Amino acid sequence: MNDLKLLRSKLSTETIEELYKKLNLLKKELFNLRFQQALGELKNTSRFSLVKKSIARIKTELTKRSNSEEY
């Protein structure tokens, strides 16, 4: 994923399925980053925070949508 800084407006236009796909990709990337760090191969440690924040943004959007559907 090239653009890790996902904008709220961009996330709000995507479907729930697309959001879950992005979430799964980001979780896999975070796993790979942790694995690389454990092996001592990770050079760009700032990527951790970018991936974590992107995951949080997607989860927030999904929660917002699920709460709005209940009412």
From Swiss-Prot:
Domain of life of the source: Bacteria
Cystine bridges: none
GO molecular function, one term: structural constituent of ribosome
One Gene Ontology biological process: translation
GO cellular component terms attached to this protein's record: cytosolic large ribosomal subunit
Transmembrane segments: none
Pfam families: Ribosomal_L29
Keyword vocabulary terms for this entry: Ribonucleoprotein, Ribosomal protein
PANTHER family: 60S RIBOSOMAL PROTEIN L35/50S RIBOSOMAL PROTEIN L29, LARGE RIBOSOMAL SUBUNIT PROTEIN UL29C
Xref: NCBIfam families: L29
Similarity section: Belongs to the universal ribosomal protein uL29 family.
Name of the protein: Large ribosomal subunit protein uL29
Source organism per UniProt: Rickettsia canadensis (strain McKiel)
